[in-house]
């Protein structure tokens, strides 16, 4: 399919490695700022000088509804150009670089629809105190970040995302502009969901006294205008940047911190610019109680009353929903972003089976601390099986359902289902190379099932976004990984030492220390 030079990105393709076989052998089927601190001197843009196409030869191609064995997949520019018999594809692309696909499987890149990358700092703490967090720290860790250290936390989260199979990530936070350049240079496909609120007296579920002691919300036109201006400025600067790899969506932070006017403005912005929008929804009991107390309705009904629900919206969490909420979300076609691993940490299993049945498309996200969508797929499968009341337990959902949620489901949420989410000719070349020759993956009656149930993120050998390798042979190409890890560890140790010096951390059920 012809594309203009503006649409055609440059590509960072590496020389053939020693394990790759010759074209003749393959045809014969023989044999088996802050960003500057964090990225390698020869980062992605410096590497992106080759114009060669790539053929993954004699490989397995996996999508949610099909597995094709011993085929080739060709990448030309930023698109998948062909899938078919290896000899035919190699003859069609005689100048392409050849990637030996024997013992490998190609999957669509995973899409993380809900991440808070700066919260990477809270690893080893935020998982174990419930939600809202019951630990009353004398000082909040994020308040101790200095200068560009917050961008450091964001970027270490992006590094984890790449290593665990993410190719598209939705960063949901306020002030994303501070980290936008660093995120763009990671090579990930990014959606910057700039989060805004206009309540001047309700801090949300993480406020020191919690929502239970909150007073009636007061809304500030000034805060609303400032938030909408941030969205507009971020959109103007970044939407469509990096050959379309960067998108900007508006986000209302929380139902309890949003006025009707803010909700309407966020949706209007999304419709004007033909993008999606997002919100945290029904993530805690205090949120539900607060909305009923001060607005007279549960959170989904409040959003519906003010025209916020709909198929452009992907709502994160939906943990505390009743039958009426589920029906309302389903009728509106609202997409639910399911953060299964974090939900399990919180001790809550959202009624995903009921939401599916009601008509809600499901996507996946990670939320805080970790950015591993592979883990999310496995936890989502197991927790949904446990929560269902099927006559024969353990049949639903299937691994194919989980892959669809994490790929095509995410593509629908970010309004890019025509170009992302599956391995099809004409779609973007956002893909993973899975090494199937691992002790925990062989033998395998169904390779996708084996990977979801038994696999590890380290099985991912290479990943590609827009036809460019961002990880190859388990080496991330867009960052100085060793330096990044060392810097993040140093900063984290300093901050947690200061937190513990300010007051003890009481672990539930354990002695104070």
Task: State what each model feature region is.
Residues 1-22:
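N-terminal secretory signal peptides
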Residues 123-188, 227-243, 489-491:
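Alpha-helical scaffold segments that flank or form the walls of functional sites
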Residues 48, 61-72, 346-347, 411-448:
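Acidic, glycine-enriched loop/beta-strand segments at the rims
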Residues 428-485:
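C-terminal cap of metal-dependent C-N hydrolases
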Residues 30, 39-43, 48-53, 61-107:
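Histidine-rich, glycine-flanked metal-binding segment
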Residues 305-312, 353-438, 454-457:
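His/Asp/Glu-enriched, well-ordered alpha-helical/loop segment
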Residues 121-152, 159, 194-221, 285-312, ...:
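Active-site gating loops and adjacent loop-to-helix segments of metal-dependent hydrolytic enzymes
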Residues 181-319:
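Metal-coordinating catalytic core of metallo-dependent amide/deamination hydrolases
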């Amino acid at each position: 399919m012809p594309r203009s030079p503006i649409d055609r990105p440059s590509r960072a393709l590496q020389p053939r490695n020693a394990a790759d076989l010759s074209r003749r052998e393959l045809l014969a089927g023989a044999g088996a700022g802050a960003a500057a601190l964090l990225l390698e001197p020869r980062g992605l843009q410096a590497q992106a000088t080759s114009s060669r196409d790539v053929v993954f030869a004699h490989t397995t191609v996996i999508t949610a509804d099909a597995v094709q064995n011993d085929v080739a997949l060709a990448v030309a520019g930023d698109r998948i150009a062909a899938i078919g018999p290896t000899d035919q594809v190699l003859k069609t692309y005689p100048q392409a670089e050849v990637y030996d696909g024997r013992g490998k499987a190609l999957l669509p890149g995973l899409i993380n629809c809900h991440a808070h990358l700066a919260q990477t700092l809270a690893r080893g703490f935020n998982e174990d105190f419930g939600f809202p967090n019951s630990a009353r720290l004398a000082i909040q860790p994020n308040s101790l970040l200095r200068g560009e250290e917050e961008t450091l936390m964001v970027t270490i989260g992006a590094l984890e995302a790449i290593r665990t199979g993410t190719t598209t990530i939705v960063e949901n936070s306020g002030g994303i502009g501070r980290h936008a350049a660093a995120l763009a240079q990671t090579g990930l496909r990014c959606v910057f969901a700039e989060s805004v609120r206009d309540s001047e007296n309700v801090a949300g579920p993480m406020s020191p006294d919690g929502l239970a002691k909150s007073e009636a919300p007061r809304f500030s036109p000034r805060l609303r205008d400032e938030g909408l201006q941030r969205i507009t400025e971020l959109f103007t600067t970044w939407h469509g940047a990096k050959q379309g790899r960067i998108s900007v969506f508006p986000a209302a932070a929380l139902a309890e911190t949003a006025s009707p006017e803010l909700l309407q403005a966020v949706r209007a912005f999304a419709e004007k610019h033909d993008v999606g929008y997002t919100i945290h929804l029904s993530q805690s009991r205090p949120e539900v109680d607060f909305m009923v107390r001060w607005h007279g309705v549960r959170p989904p009904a409040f959003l519906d009353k003010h025209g916020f629900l709909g198929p452009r919206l992907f709502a994160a969490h939906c943990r505390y929903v009743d039958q009426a909420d589920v029906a309302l979300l389903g009728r509106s076609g609202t997409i639910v972003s399911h953060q299964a691993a974090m939900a399990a940490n919180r001790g809550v299993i959202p009624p995903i089976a009921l939401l599916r049945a009601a008509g809600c498309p499901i996507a996946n996200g990670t939320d805080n601390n970790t950015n591993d969508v592979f883990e999310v797929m496995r936890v989502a499968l197991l927790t949904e099986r446990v929560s269902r009341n099927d006559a024969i337990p353990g049949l639903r959902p299937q691994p194919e359902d989980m892959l669809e949620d994490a790929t095509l489901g995410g593509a629908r949420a970010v309004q890019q289902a025509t170009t992302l989410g599956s391995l099809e000719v004409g779609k973007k070349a956002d893909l993973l190379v899975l090494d199937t020759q691992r002790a925990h993956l062989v033998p395998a009656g169904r390779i996708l099932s084996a990977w979801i149930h038994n696999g590890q993120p380290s099985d991912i050998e290479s990943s590609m976004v827009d036809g460019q390798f961002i990880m190859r042979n388990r080496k991330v190409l867009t960052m100085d990984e060793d330096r990044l890890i060392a810097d993040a560890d140093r900063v984290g140790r300093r901050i947690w030492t200061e937190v513990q010096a300010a007051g003890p951390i009481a672990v539930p059920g354990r002695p104070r220390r």
